[in-house]
Amino acid sequence: MAGKFELKKSKNDKFYFSLLAGNGQTILSSEMYEAKASAVNGIESVKKNAGDAARYEKAVAKNGSPYFNLKAANGQVIGSSEMYESEASRDNGIASVKANAPDASVVDETA
């Protein structure tokens, strides 16, 4: 089963998206956007940048949990991962974004 982006609207009328792997697990989440068009642009940016290893920033949270950010060419964060148990799990998450994002469908759940 292929990955997909879910475009959603929050209770406070902001827009955001999540990238789900084929198994339904969320592997990347966006920030909140004021406009739907901006969130759609964010999805396109993830698709464009997902295959470039240099766009992934590996990090460790204060509690020691590894995670990653996907950045656009201008350095802006366009998506963040969940917190992982290990660096190996984080690296698998990055591989999953690389594999799923470029051809993922977009499911608009904002209506």
Spans of features found by a protein language model:
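Charged, low-complexity amphipathic helices and coil/IDR segments
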Residues: 1-3, 103
